[in-house]
Amino acid sequence: SHVATDNYAGGVEAGKLMGKLLHGKGTVAIISYPALQSVVARVDGFKKGLSDTPDIKIVAEQPGITRAEALTTAQNIMQANANLNGLFGFGDDAALAAVIAAKSAHNDNIKIIGFDGMKEARDAVDSEKTFAAVIRQYPDQMGAKAIDAAVDHLNGKPVEKMIPVQPGVYTGK
């Protein structure tokens, strides 16, 4: 069995939330990592979540694998799109880098959404105006479901090939 976050569902939640945060209109960018299937699922989900808001345009989708690369990517995107309204980072490092880029671009109104939910990102959602939300993964639930599946298998019960864990949304304390 493969126990993992439902990355597509998390992306859909991020896209829907971005649509609400931008009141259905504006421009957004995506920092991605197209070599990873989990990230492709997140980005595809994000686009699906935005599909109900046709007045939001995706103006850039560029890779930024490490935090340093994501910072350069975010800076380049914001320089080319001075009035960028939103940015989806495929992971917390990409989103945290985008927060720094937004500060240096003096863009206090951009809405940034990340994905993973590590403590540093949740703290930044609490303290940074531009970091609007993070899609949270739940490794404790993944571990519990993996143990349950292993026990079921050892007891001769059928086990699903894929066991998705639904992500959550963190928008602050």
Protein language model features and the residues they cover:
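A residue-level marker of the well-folded mature domains of exported/periplasmic proteins
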Residues: 1-173
